């Protein structure tokens, strides 16, 4: 009987999950919005995986469960994960499984972005931007709504532009103000959208890729990788081909599923029914820096399970996760 492995990537904007077999083939997958409720989102993606498995009439026995993403400790505790890993490692492993010769990973998610430099199959450098929303999936969604365009159509509309507008995307406030100004000037919606896509790519490269050598093969991943306009903008600015896989938005979940396979110690009795757990939530504002993040502490009678909402990663480093 084949062995299978579950990977879950719980982000602030979206939650992704995959089940892979011993050959690293994805046999079930799901991508849903987190909507500020990581536990509920996880229940939904696991339920979806369960239905896909039942439909295929395949008997699934798990030999590994992995979690990654901003709520990885919390969800790892709930699922009884055998491995919990940071996003950099998970995304790199997921990418290398599809692109063994990858040397640069550009990743833009819902509220953060990152560049990962790989040499000889090993991560040698990386940079993350979790402090500014400009250029993230949430930013693009907000601008699409403002312009009356479906987010899934944003990239296609951008490709119809003949003269992309110059949009200042260094800050969401400036970008939105500039967008309104350009519209008032009579610049077409297509040119504004193309300008937004180019601004996102330019902002990413200027902020995250300073002093970093971007070498082929360049892989674009994360939810925003599905925006063909941003992909084309990266290719234009880098003068390189940028690759996007059909599962590029799932690479974090794929990567941690692969890691759970590598660290498997045997069969895991998991019935895909997440039981309700007793936990408490306490919110408070962190005054450690000018971000003033709204933190959400999740804990049970044994202590803190996870702290969510830290944009600088301060509390990700201090929360210890233990398999119970």
Map each language-model feature to its residues.
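Gly/Thr-rich phosphate-binding beta-strand-loop-beta motif of the actin/hexokinase/Hsp70
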Residues: 1-23, 102-119, 288-300
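Short glycine-rich, Thr/Ser-proximal phosphate-binding strand/loop in the N-terminal lobe
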Residues: 4-44, 125-126, 130-131, 311-312
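Glycine-rich phosphate-binding loop plus the immediately following alpha-helix
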Residues: 35-39, 120-163, 171, 262, ...
